[in-house]
Design a protein with these regions (language model features):
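Conserved beta-strand-loop-alpha-helix junction that forms the acyl-donor binding cleft
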Residues: 87-97, 101, 113-123
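Short hydrophobic clusters on alpha-helical segments that form packing/core surfaces
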Residues: 74-78, 96
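Active-site beta-strand termini and strand-to-loop segments that position acidic
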Residues: 30-32, 122-125
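Residue-level detector of high-confidence beta-strand sites
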Residues: 38, 108-110
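Conserved acetyl-CoA pyrophosphate-binding loop and the N-cap/start of the following alpha-helix
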Residues: 61, 65-73
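A short, internal acetyl-CoA/4′-phosphopantetheine-binding micro-motif in the GNAT/acyltransferase core
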Residues: 55-62, 89-90
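Conserved GNAT acetyl-CoA-binding A-motif
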Residues: 78-89
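Acetyl-CoA-dependent GNAT
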Residues: 1-54, 58, 77
């Protein structure tokens, strides 16, 4: 599936499903047909939610806006189908935290949870997550 490219991202980004089951999907992130990263999804029918995991852009492609573009695309796509889109991020994953802050996410002042992770909610259409 193609990710529409804006003028500043002259190269073409796309997602290619690498594997899929009822509750999980793994996709390669492609730039002009070459793999530059990956992203995984876990689907929870009972609460109509999707969790994002294993989201990674290769080191040589970081800092160029590709992660932002992919994440915005995924959120826009899945908020049409799901009531909740979220992820957990390790407290020491500074690159991911920087990306999520760029998208307007605020991190809990009390710090991460007992697993040293932050819960990041990208979209919530009335799902009680408490």
């Amino acid at each position: 599936m193609k990710i529409n490219s804006n003028e500043s991202l002259a190269k073409k980004l796309s997602l290619r499903t690498a594997s899929r089951s009822k509750n999980e999907a793994y996709s390669d992130i492609l730039l002009d047909g070459n793999k530059i990263g990956e992203i995984a999804f876990s689907f929870y029918d009972d609460i109509n939610a999707v969790g994002i995991g294993n989201f990674e852009i290769s080191a040589e492609h970081r800092g160029k806006g590709y992660g932002t573009k992919v994440l915005k695309f995924v959120i826009d796509k899945y908020k049409k189908k799901f009531d909740l889109i979220y992820c957990f991020v390790d407290a020491d994953n500074y690159g991911a935290i920087k990306l999520y802050k760029k998208l307007g996410k605020v991190f809990d002042e009390d710090g991460p949870n007992v697993n040293n992770q932050y819960y990041v909610e990208f979209y919530n259409n009335g799902v009680d997550v408490e």
